[in-house]
Amino acid sequence: MNPAVKPSPSSGGRALEAAQAALAAEHAAAYGYGVIGARIDPARATEAREAYGQHLSRRDRLTRTVRELGGAPRPSEAAYTLPFEVRSGDDAVRLAADIEDRVAGAYSDLVRAADGQLRRDAADALSAAAVRAARWRGVGVAFPGLTERAEGGRTS
């Protein structure tokens, strides 16, 4: 076990639960970027591929983290329900921003639940998702990772 992610007795359960939720968000993001790749305008295809690769990398790291925290990583679902139908390049961009908001929310929860290196890693992932969301949307939000909470639970 990597001592950098070893939880304290009081935070271990919360950190594991939040890491599992972040892992689930990364699984969903990978699926979503598959849909995005099929609809995105060619001018933004490279950006979508890079984001997809970053989500796969984070997913793999979270899989290891969940194990290090003593859990069994949850597998991805066979398919995910999208928040809206993706018919065009504009829809693909909107989905990408939505995905990044959701991922940022999951990492925000992990930042609150974890400590030490795991908290720093979660903060880095939150920041990266917020930057990607701002690039897709064309504008940032005041409190990345809290978007859906600020909108009263509305996520799309």
What is each stretch, according to the model?
Residues 1-156:
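All-alpha RGS (Regulator of G-protein Signaling) helical domain and cognate RGS-like helical scaffolds
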